[in-house]
Each structure stands twice: as C-alpha cells, then as structure tokens.
Amino acid sequence: MDTSSKENAHLFHKNSAQPAGGPSFTVGYPSTEEARPCCGKLKVFLGALSFVYFAKALAEGYLKSTVTQIERRFEIPSSLVGIIDGSFEIGNLLVITFVSYFGAKLHRPKIIGAGCLVMGFGTMLIAVPQFFMEKYSYEKYERYSPSSNVTPSISPCYLESSSPSPSSILGKSQNKISHECVGDSSSSMWVYVFLGNLLRGLGETPIQPLGIAYLDDFASEDNAAFYIGCVQTVAIIGPIFGFLLGSLCAKLYVDIGFVNLDHITITPKDPQWVGAWWLGYLIAGFLSLLAAVPFWCLPKTLPRSQSRENSGSTSEKSKFIDDPIHYQMAPGDDKMKIMEMAKDFLPSLKTLFRNPVYILYLCASTVQFNSLFGMVTYKPKYIEQQYGQSSSKANFVIGLINIPAVALGIFSGGIVMKKFRLGICEATKLYLGSSVFGYLLFLSLFALGCENSSVAGLTVSYQGTKPVSYHERALFSDCNSRCKCSDSKWEPMCGDNGITYVSACLAGCQSSSRSGKNIIFSNCTCVGFAAPKSGNWSGMMGRCQKDNGCSQMFLYFLVISVITSYTLSLGGIPGYILLLRCIQPQLKSFALGIYTLAVRVLAGIPAPVYFGVLIDTSCLKWGFKKCGSRGSCRLYDSHAFRHIYLGLTTLLGTVSVFLSMAVLFVLKKKYVSKHSSLITTREKIGMSSSIKKETCAARDRGLQPKYWPGKETRL
C-alpha cells in the first residue's frame, strides 16, 4: 500500500486515509525553499542559546558555592539560606505558565533576550548589600593590636584573684553592645539577595521552554536530541566556572579593597572566614546582559528541516498521543490576538493533565529534583563540615571534578540517543537504569564519613573521653571554673593535646603572645587537664585539623561522587526526549513550561528549605549576633549531618525510581493498546479477502518502525 508520510501518520491515528490537502502541523511555518538563506540562523540560535545557558548556569553554580559565605556574612541559619536559594524558583513561578503558553505564539527569541536583561540586573542586585553594610566583624581577641607584630602577654582567662572589677568590664561591654544594636542595620540586608535572586528567576523563565521548543521545532529529527544534548552540556560547563569562580573569591577576604588585609587575623581555613562572595555576582550579571544581544537579531521563525517538512509529525508520537493532529495555528502565524490565544489555554491544560505518561514523568522528575536540589545546595557545606575542608577547596573540587562528570554524562546520553536511534521505550529504560544504578552507588557514601572533631564540652569531655552528654553548662568544667568566660562566643583554640576548645578562656589559658598573625596561648589548665603527663599546656588560635584518615575518606568520597554524578546524568537527555515526544507538538512549549513550573514550585523552592531545616537540627554550637539573637551555626554533629543529608537524598531518589518504573509500564501498555486497536480496526474495513492477502505484507511492513514517517527513532 503506497501512501505518503502524512497519510501514513493519519492512518495510525484516524485509521483512515487523510486527504492530501488536510491540515498538518506545518501550517504557518515557512517552507524550506522560501527561507533557504536563513538556514544558518539555526546554528546562530544554537550558539546564542548555549551561551545564555552557560551564563545562567554559571550564576546558579556561583550561588551554590556562596551558600556558606552568605550564611556567615549575614549571620543567618541554613533554613533561611534555603529560602534565599528558593527565591529563584519563586520568580520563575510568578510568570512561567503565561510565558510558556503565550510566548510560544509570539517572538520567542526577543522574549528570551528580554529575560536575559532582567536576569543580568537581578544577579548584580545580589551584590549590592556589600556596598551598604558595615565591614565584616568576626569574633576575635580584640585586645591584640593588629598594627604590631608582637603583642605583650595578656590573659584570656580573667582570674578571680587578679582580674579587674567584673562590673566595670561588663558595663563597658554592655554599652558597646547597645551601641552596636542601634547601628546594626545590616541584619536585614539579606533581603536584597532574596530580591536579586527572585529577579534572576523572572528573567530565566523563557529560556528553557521557549528556547528548547524553538530548537526542537526547526532542527531535523535526527539532530534534535544531539542539539539539546549540546545545550545541556554547555549548561553544565557553566557551573564548573561558577564553582571555580566561587573557589577563587572564597580565598579573597570579604572586604578586600576596603580594609588593610595585614590587620586580618583569620585565614580561609578558619570557620569564621568570609570570602569576597559579592564579586562573582558582578561578573555573572555582566555575562547575562551580554547574552541578551544576539536574541534581538534573530527572526521569529526559521525554515523547517526537510525531514520535518515531509513527515509532518513523528511516528513515535503517533503511538502514545490520542488524536494529536488537529488544526491549530503554529508559532509562525502572525498577529494572533491575546484573547484568541487565551481561548485554548484551559483545553490545552486539560489535554496535558489527561496524558498519563506526561503526568507520571512529571511526578518522577519532581521527586528526583527534590533530591538533586537539596544535595547540590548543601554539598559544599557537607564537604566542609564532614571532611574539614575549606570553603575554597570544597568549591574547587566540585567545579573541577563533579560537574565535568555531570557534563560528560549528559553529553553521553545525547550521543547514545543519536547513535542508536533509541525509541521512547528504550529512552525510558536508559533513564530508569541510570537512576537505579546511580542511587545504589550513592548508598556507599554512608560508609565514607569522618568522626566528629574533638571539641571540649561538645563532642568530648574536658578529659578527652567520648561520648559527652550535652547540657547548658557543658562548656564549663573544674579546669576553667576560676575564669570569667562567655559560652556564647566562638573563638576556637587548638590545644597541643589535639582537642579544640570553644575559646582560649574556656581552655583556662592564663597567658598569650602573638607573632604576626599567629597567637600562641600558654599555661592552659584545661589542656593539661586532658593530658596531664605531657607537660605542654599550650595551644594556638584556630580549630584542630581532622586526622589523616579523614583525608583518605575524602578521596574515596570524591571518586564515588564522580561516578554517581556521571551515572545519574546519563539519563538526563533520554528523559528530556521522553518529555518532548509524549506530547502534541503544538503543546510542546506549554508542556515544558508546566514541567518547569512543577519542578520549580514542588522541588526548587521547598527542597533547599526543608533540607536546611533538618540540617540545622544537627548543629552543636550556634553563633550569636551583636544584639544577642542567634546567628549561623559554628559546629555540626558530623554523624547526624551525614545521616540527614545522605538519607534524605537517597529516600527521595528511591521514590523517583518507582515512579519512573510506572512511566515505563504505562508506555508499554499504551503501545500494546494502540497496536491492537490499529489491527482490529483494519480488519473491520470492508475489503475482499484477496485484497487483504495482497496488502497483508505491506501492512506488516507499515507496522515496522523503519516504515513509519518519523524515522528518527525505533522501538
């Protein structure tokens, strides 16, 4: 039976031949012959879209790398940092539905360009608080004169017998605190970071649904998956540079250019260190503004490829979409009125929600992104707290090792889809298999943790024994009972016995000296209390480093983390192609918009918040602001942090795997149903038995994938 590709597509959906003049999805698109000179502009659009993906991904990666810096600079808990991180998704939520639906019928490149401008200004707004806040003030021994290299010996411990009147000291201290409280207007400056990130979300809204749909509309079916894979790979390269930029800025002091760095007594390894977090946002904002330029020069539509021109729709869609071919104006039609476009909004939404494959994939992706958003947001903090690494090093290894593995995985997924021409079922199997294997590997990370740092009164007793029962007076002991110490300060000192003390005062140190930036404390009674035979009762400012075994565990963690990242990302492009192929072409942008909306609202906003709230429960020592309110966490329980962080990620990943299995089950069921319905309907057609015999072979050939009009995939 000789039919055109259009008629063959109609045969699968209407079970009858379609007249040659019937409507198809090519309505409104310029023909290949008409717009031949514009063919090269698809590559220009591909390059422009890749660059804007790079710019937005760089800013997102940089934001993740500055989570701990922002937490310390503004003295806020992890839960509030999670809300700031989620403001990007809130901005997306405000306009995503309308942008994805109406934007698909307007000038898509210009809408993307306008979004880039908003995104650029929002990114720069995040850096604004640095120029209006007071200089960063960390907890330090203020009696030391930073202008001198050697400081006379003073006693951190105010002995009862020799200290001046405590009332006079406390009076001066209270006056200072009261004055600082009046002038402390910087405590709410984090709101600008929230608003800037929200603007970033508003500006980013049109990029994914309109950009990917535009690319898929005008690329050949053979190249669509490859092009999308290229864009997604470039998008992963962005965070590499974002984390590397974050690593560089974390080494620079927050007030660089505003203070004399010779007077700074802490180093990047100190838990109170805050890097130049604001600097990277200025760079990322400029790149976003630059990315807007090419989109203002691109046309509203491009010529469709010859394969799309001939086929009109893909065979893969025909097996899973009920009645996909009906007349609707395509994105190329000009001057559609808003009311005309809005008329089909609810019917289109209803059509999407009646698609079981789309809904199940939406649920699976949402749960999986909850896992991924929470994991990525707090990964730098996890590396810092679990393995004792600096913020700069944590960002460096994520940017240089983890993210390239993700990029390679996404690119490999696109190559596999193109080379083996996988159908929807095979793509779903690859997506499911990568998730299962990836989360199984992730389980091994539970065994790669480190012991808690030995901190007197928090993780070990003052005698150095474990465990310690924490209570309100746990930081005080007989060895520091004669000292007038505050238990709210965090001025860590590493004793020669390998135990960290919350402050030199709580270590019972009676004398000290300074040479350059190094402060040596001596005659520390609590150090001798834990190691009475050593005879060396001294210590140095700063936390004690974790043992060498922890460094070895960190290397194993990196290896498993890289393999897991590659495995999970391998299913990214197959999953994306499943999303594009299970819906009607004219609803593609709208479906991508709803998908993005669901991921933003149900994963991007809540995941960092509830991850942060649960992580805060593992805090052992909170810092305090000038006015006495609670600030950011200074020390976490490593065991509790590990179980919360890894356990929650694994739990969500497991749920997403079961939902992905349901997607595959429904796909297979719909294919068998469509296949059987087609054969039954054909057998009812009034034909003579001789004609049936004559056309049987041709019909069987027609059911084989290579005879379907959209030959880009095979089941």
From Swiss-Prot:
Q: What intrachain disulfides are recorded?
A: C479-C509, C485-C505, C494-C526
Q: Does the keyword Membrane apply?
A: yes
The record's annotation in Pfam families points to: Kazal_2, OATP
Domain (Kazal-like) ranges: 473-528
> What is the deletion mutant like?
Knockout mice present a general hypothyroidal state of the CNS, with reduced levels of both T3 and T4, and increased activity of the iodothyronine-deiodinase D2.
Question: What is its membrane topology?
Answer: Multi-pass membrane protein
Intervals, Cytoplasmic compartment: 1-43, 104-109, 217-235, 300-351, 418-421, 581-589, 668-715
Catalyses:
3,3',5'-triiodo-L-thyronine(out) = 3,3',5'-triiodo-L-thyronine(in); L-thyroxine(out) = L-thyroxine(in); L-thyroxine sulfate(out) = L-thyroxine sulfate(in); 17beta-estradiol 17-O-(beta-D-glucuronate)(out) = 17beta-estradiol 17-O-(beta-D-glucuronate)(in)
Keyword terms of this UniProt record: Cell membrane, Disulfide bond, Glycoprotein, Ion transport, Lipid transport, Membrane, Transmembrane, Transmembrane helix, Transport
The record's GO molecular-function terms, alphabetically, read: organic anion transmembrane transporter activity; thyroid hormone transmembrane transporter activity
Gene that produces this protein: Slco1c1
For the keyword Transmembrane helix, the answer is yes
Protein name in UniProt: Solute carrier organic anion transporter family member 1C1
Q: Which domain of life is it from?
A: Eukaryota
Q: Which cellular component appears as one GO term in the record?
A: basolateral plasma membrane
Record's function text: Mediates the Na(+)-independent high affinity transport of thyroid hormones at the plasma membrane of brain capillary endothelial cells. The transport activity of substrates L-thyroxine (T4) and 3,3',5'-triiodo-L-thyronine (reverse T3, rT3) is much greater than that of 3,3',5-triiodo-L-thyronine (T3). The prehormone, T4, is the major form in the circulating blood and is converted to the active form, T3, by the iodothyronine-deiodinase in peripheral organs. T3 plays an essential role in brain development via binding to specific nuclear receptors (thyroid hormone receptor).
Task: Give its localization.
Answer: Cell membrane
Fetch the InterPro entries from UniProt: Kazal_dom, Kazal_dom_sf, MFS_dom, MFS_trans_sf, OATP
Which segments does the topology annotation call Extracellular? 64-82, 135-187, 257-274, 374-393, 446-557, 616-649
Q: Would you list which residues are glycosylated?
A: N452, N523, N536
The entry sums up its family as follows: Belongs to the organo anion transporter (TC 2.A.60) family.
Q: What is its main location?
A: membrane
Regarding tissue, the record states:
Widely expressed throughout the brain except in the cerebellum. Not detected in kidney, heart, lung, skeletal muscle, spleen, liver, nor testis. Highly expressed in cerebral microvessels throughout the brain and in the choroid plexus (at mRNA and protein level).
Provide the transmembrane region boundaries.
44-63, 83-103, 110-134, 188-216, 236-256, 275-299, 352-373, 394-417, 422-445, 558-580, 590-615, 650-667
Which GO biological-process labels does this protein carry? lipid transport; monoatomic ion transport; positive regulation of thyroid hormone generation
